[in-house]
Amino acid sequence: MSKKSFVKGPSGLPKELNNDKQWNYSLVNIWVASLALKLLLSVGYHSTDFDVHRNWLAITYNLPISKWYIENTSQWTLDYPPFFAYFEWVLASFVPDFVKRDGCLKIVEKGLYSLPTVLFQRLSVIVSEVVLFVSLQWYINSSKTHTEAKRAFVVASSLVLSPGLLIIDHIHFQYNGMLYGILVLMINSARLKKYLMCGFWFSILICFKHIYLYLAPAVFIFLLRAYCLNLNFGKTKSSNILKIVRWKNLFKLSSIVIAVFSIAFGPFIYYEVMPQLIERLFPFNRGLTHAYWAPNVWAIYSAIDRLLIQIYYRIPISRPILLKIFKFNPQYLWDTKLVNKTTRGLIGDVEFLILPTITSQLTFFLTLFYQVMALIPLFLQPTFRRFMGSLTLCGFASFLFGWHVHEKAVLVVIFPMTFLVSRDRDLLGPFNLLVSCAYISLFPLIFTCDEWLIKITYMLLWYIVYYFSLKKVVRLPKTNGGYGKVILDRVNNGYILGLVPVITIVSLIDLFEHKFEILRKLQFMKLLIISVYCGIGIISSWNGFSWLYFVDESIWTDE
């Protein structure tokens, strides 16, 4: 391959490296174009999460701060950290009088509202999402070369146009765009080696939504190793031992983190309601899986349990074998109510009928184990790309092995991995498998006919556009990987294409279940199909990404 020739810029440096930037990649046009679709969707379907946030507006508007985490008139109690409660309080102050009269700010058991409340809350999501656009524009603008800026633009545009955000925020109803915007601020601060800003933004993010604790181990190790520790040993061993900690840096970072958490939790400590707040944030009395199984290890485990139940019923010769292997109580299998309990995410303990019951302690141990495995290389090599890889694997571990994981939590994996995918073409395989399975797994959140065509068409167009866009800008690997790599790519693409019949089957069940009683009895089957198929895909993506993380050193340097 011939060496690339550079044209000299005004400063005497190669034009590709010249600081006088000539490019302009703006997200403004994308924001304007996407705004039209979001406004059209604003009057369509919304989930119960809409009334959740309406109730939080009412709580923070009508009650003193000391009552926010105690109020329980509605089942939709406030269970996000304080900064999100403050956000709802600020938002409530902008509610117009005609929206107030519509019932937006009334504390009631079940919200009674109409179009004015819907439009106000929909617009609040759209406006708050500006944080994501601004943070990603900063990410693009801070690129050092034209090639880097082009890659950054593809990455940024794929995130602001994410089918996940469209489904979860603008149809289902949540505020993830704003929160992931703060995550991007943290990520770009780390990229620019602004470690204090990195700690500041992540502390704020945790105080907005505690799901990002999934990523905390990677952030902690990165800041500790890159900013607070000095492990460059010299000749004088004794002096190095004394100076292994950069005390000034540690003090500055600790002060920022403590200050943020003090502002967030200080008022609740003062009013002595911290126990109630902690109980709201961490309700450990919930089951292993959510009502709709998130596509992770436990979805597959649950499906195997139900498969073994059917084998036990239909193949009598298998009964003594299953009893000997799994040592379960066969009396439970003849309890019709227990067997027909197709959802496992309701309040209470989770009991499997044949397979051993999974405890919260086991899920914590598995999550911690796989996170620690990802943290070791980060501690030894605290580069930005290694940090992003560790961040991705911490998200994977929490999503795949965590307790009571929601399907929406898969965005915690997608966002950090997206920032890495343009680094090396080998990452495209795990990435494509992840996003295709993850976004399809969100489809059951939107089960109405009016939005069916939108979610299918939007997902398909997004995947086609960014499949080729990322392929065009991605860095080629140093080795082609041989015939085995070709086979693996074909298997990945084949599995992704398998999502087409999966969606077709599920859609046909939706279409004809009102006509056929047998389909009504198999109502949970369509959720199981999506959870299991997408779960296998996401686990495969995790395996492929982990292999590259631990084996391919060239991807993770900052060169």
Swiss-Prot record:
It catalyses: an alpha-D-Glc-(1->3)-alpha-D-Man-(1->2)-alpha-D-Man-(1->2)-alpha-D-Man-(1->3)-[alpha-D-Man-(1->2)-alpha-D-Man-(1->3)-[alpha-D-Man-(1->2)-alpha-D-Man-(1->6)]-alpha-D-Man-(1->6)]-beta-D-Man-(1->4)-beta-D-GlcNAc-(1->4)-alpha-D-GlcNAc-diphospho-di-trans,poly-cis-dolichol + a di-trans,poly-cis-dolichyl beta-D-glucosyl phosphate = an alpha-D-Glc-(1->3)-alpha-D-Glc-(1->3)-alpha-D-Man-(1->2)-alpha-D-Man-(1->2)-alpha-D-Man-(1->3)-[alpha-D-Man-(1->2)-alpha-D-Man-(1->3)-[alpha-D-Man-(1->2)-alpha-D-Man-(1->6)]-alpha-D-Man-(1->6)]-beta-D-Man-(1->4)-beta-D-GlcNAc-(1->4)-alpha-D-GlcNAc-diphospho-di-trans,poly-cis-dolichol + a di-trans,poly-cis-dolichyl phosphate + H(+). The keyword Transferase applies. It is an enzyme of class 2 (transferase). It comes from the Eukaryota. Belongs to the ALG6/ALG8 glucosyltransferase family. Dolichyl pyrophosphate Glc1Man9GlcNAc2 alpha-1,3-glucosyltransferase that operates in the biosynthetic pathway of dolichol-linked oligosaccharides, the glycan precursors employed in protein asparagine (N)-glycosylation. The assembly of dolichol-linked oligosaccharides begins on the cytosolic side of the endoplasmic reticulum membrane and finishes in its lumen. The sequential addition of sugars to dolichol pyrophosphate produces dolichol-linked oligosaccharides containing fourteen sugars, including two GlcNAcs, nine mannoses and three glucoses. This is Dolichyl pyrophosphate Glc1Man9GlcNAc2 alpha-1,3-glucosyltransferase. It comes from Debaryomyces hansenii (strain ATCC 36239 / CBS 767 / BCRC 21394 / JCM 1990 / NBRC 0083 / IGC 2968). The gene is ALG8.
